[in-house]
Each structure stands twice: as structure tokens, then as C-alpha cells.
Design a protein with these regions (language model features):
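Conserved beta-hairpin
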Residues: 143-156
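Short, compact, well-ordered microdomains
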Residues: 101-108, 112-113
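N-terminal charged segments
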Residues: 1-104, 124-141
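Conserved GNAT acetyl-CoA-binding A-motif
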Residues: 63-66, 164, 193-205
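Short, charged/polar, Gly/Pro-enriched secondary-structure boundary elements
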Residues: 115-122
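Conserved acetyl-CoA-binding loop-helix of GNAT-fold acetyltransferases
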Residues: 168, 172, 178-192, 210-216
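A conserved beta-strand-loop-helix scaffold within acyl/acetyltransferase catalytic domains
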Residues: 153-165, 170-173
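Conserved beta-strand-loop-alpha-helix junction that forms the acyl-donor binding cleft
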Residues: 201-211, 215, 220, 228-229
Length: 229
């Protein structure tokens, strides 16, 4: 088990106490043992009471399946390959059928600890508007807030997702990409989180430009996840 850099930061939310504990430990680098374990816990929720049908989180040699299903069913489904199967297409499809949902995309899960300093990038808070990234945030998060650069060429959205964790997403218009703006947005985001809580980001592994931006801004990859909505 990885050693902690200190006490876990405060992470307040609702639903899925086991998921909250896992996230709090992951935030400070304290990971489950790489023992091929697949742990089933109850499904989490959003702050407004909406239930997440299922969430699968995994790291090096461990997985957590957060869903209101029989743990014995999960164990039987992944017994042939507990290292790879929990985030594999076959199990995720079966889980989605079991809970009556649709599997989302597989994302890399990254975290940034609270930042005491003000954002190092000039940002203007604005209304939600019609940007696709903001519409998606409104569909999957609560307490959504949006900032843009003064010229409107880049956007940062912040909101509370699974178990009330703070999550962010950034977008840079194609005409201004390649100038480090994505990295600047990723670096600025943690300072916008109220209450000294960690901030999370889900990045598609194929989106290498976004992944590089978050890593360059000091974000730490802690696993992968799929949300079944």
C-alpha cells in the first residue's frame, strides 16, 4: 500500500460511504493493495439525490464495483480474470443490463489536492450557456459553475459529481491550442474549489492532448473508472 503524504483532505458528499473513503485515500496516494481484489459496495449518489446506477473504479491490481447488485454475481462474472475483467467491455455490459443502465466511457481518473493560491490565469465566471461540455456537466453534476478566459477561447467547468466530489472539465478552442492554455486551465482549477476539497478529472485515455495538459499541471493519475448511467 502506498504511503500517505499526510491526512486525507476533507471530502464531503452523500451516498456511497465506501466510495467516499476510497476517494479520500486515493487523493493522498493511499491505494488498495494490488491483490486482485474486486470489492462490491452500494451504488453512490449525487447531492440532489439522483442515484448513479453503478460506478466501477480500478487501479493496479484492485477494483471496486459500486452497484446495488449481489457481490456473488460480480465475483462470478469476473472470476476468470479479476485483474482485467472489471473494466472490460463484457462485464460492463452485463453490469449495465443488471442495473438497467448504459455503460459510459472508460476514463483515466486524475486528482489534484487543494490549492491555497489564487488561479494563475485570468478567468471570468459566466453563465452555463450552451457549450456541449457545460451541458454534459449539468446532466451529470450539481452546483455547476463555469469560467472562461476573457476572450472566450477557453472554458473551465466545475461541479459536484459522484458522492459530491468536485470534478472539472476544460475546453480550448482549436484556433488557440498548442499554446499551453489547457495546462494553465488545469493548473488554475484546484484553486476554485471551495472548502479545501480535492478536485477530480476524468480524461479519456485517447485524448492525449488533454491528458498531457493535466499531467503537466501536476495532476496525479490514480486509476480508471466507468460510470453506468
Amino acid at each position: 500500500m502506498a504511503s500517505s503524504q499526510g491526512p486525507a483532505p476533507s471530502l464531503r458528499g452523500v451516498g456511497g460511504d465506501e466510495v467516499l473513503r476510497l476517494l479520500s485515500r486515493l487523493a493522498v496516494g493511499k491505494t488498495p493493495p494490488a491483490d486482485a481484489s474486486v470489492t462490491t459496495v452500494p451504488a453512490p449518489a449525487l447531492l440532489d439525490g439522483r442515484r448513479v446506477r453503478a460506478l466501477v473504479v480500478g487501479g493496479t491490481g484492485w477494483h471496486v464495483v459500486a452497484a446495488d447488485v449481489d457481490p456473488a454475481w460480480v465475483a462470478a462474472q469476473v472470476a476468470h480474470d479479476p485483474i482485467e475483467a472489471p473494466l472490460g467491455a463484457r462485464f460492463l455490459s452485463a453490469l449495465a443490463d443488471r442495473v438497467g443502465g448504459e455503460p459510459g466511457v472508460l476514463d483515466a481518473l486524475l486528482v489534484a489536492l487543494p490549492a491555497p493560491a489564487a488561479p494563475g490565469l485570468e478567468l471570468v465566471e459566466t453563465g452555463p450557456g450552451e457549450h456541449p461540455r457545460v451541458r454534459r456537466a449539468l446532466a451529470h453534476r450539481t452546483d455547476v459553475r463555469v469560467w472562461t478566459t476573457p476572450d472566450g477561447t477557453a472554458l473551465l467547468a466545475l461541479g459536484r459529481g459522484v458522492c459530491g466530489r468536485w470534478e472539472t472539465g476544460v475546453e480550448v478552442q482549436p484556433a488557440v491550442r498548442g499554446r499551453g492554455l489547457g495546462t494553465a486551465l488545469a493548473a488554475a482549477a484546484p484553486a476554485l474549489v471551495p472548502g479545501g476539497e480535492p478536485l477530480w478529472a476524468q480524461v479519456a485515455p485517447a485524448n492525449t492532448a488533454s491528458l498531457r495538459s493535466f499531467l503537466a499541471a501536476g495532476w496525479r493519475p490514480v486509476g480508471a473508472e466507468v460510470v453506468v448511467g
